[in-house]
A protein has these predicted regions:
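Residue-level marker of positions within ordered structural domains that often coincide
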Residues: 40, 122, 153
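HKD (HxKxxxxD) catalytic microenvironment of the phospholipase D
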Residues: 35, 97-144, 148
Length: 166
């Protein structure tokens, strides 16, 4: 992945899985208050992997008021393939909130990650990994924030951090 330019607004193109992982880690590290992520099941962003979970943990530990909101269509991937992320949710149940999107307004092919209303990563709905990340660009991030917040409010309740079995 190319280095982020010095002067805002800053655009970084994403064309491979390695560039996506580097961009996501950069976005998480730049977030100072809130991180919002929306994807059908979060697997495309590999949020269950060690590095993103470690970065999210560091973000949540940095300030008591920091928040992470994850919006998904299908909880199956989180329940079966993301034990690190679920463990993080158990440790930070007050700050890491996960919701399942409304069936009438699914996330679908939209894959976005937004940090602090200024930085945003968006992937295109293609077979390969193609997307872009903008830093210090509220003009690019604001429509994504509005769309995310609308879906978040219409989504179901927060998903439990503990299994609800007997």
């Amino acid at each position: 992945m190319q280095d982020v330019p010095v002067d805002p607004p800053q655009r970084v193109l994403i064309g491979s899985r390695a560039e996506l992982e580097a961009a996501l880690l950069l976005l998480i590290s730049r977030a100072r208050r809130q991180l919002r992520v929306a994807a059908a099941d979060l697997s495309v962003l590999s949020l269950g992997s060690l590095q993103p979970v470690t970065a999210m943990r560091a973000m949540l530990l940095a300030r008591p008021g920091n928040r992470i909101h994850l919006l998904v269509d299908d909880m199956a991937w989180l329940d079966t393939r993301a034990p690190r992320l679920r463990s993080l949710q158990q440790d930070f149940a007050h700050a890491l909130r996960i919701r399942c999107a409304d069936a009438q307004d699914p996330v679908g092919h939209d894959v976005v990650a937004i940090g602090d209303d200024l930085d945003a990563l968006r992937l295109q709905p293609t077979v390969g990994v193609v997307g872009e990340m903008w830093c210090h660009n509220g003009t690019f991030a604001q429509p994504l924030v509005t769309e995310f917040d609308r879906r978040w409010e219409h989504a179901s309740h927060d998903q439990s951090s503990q299994p609800l079995g007997l």
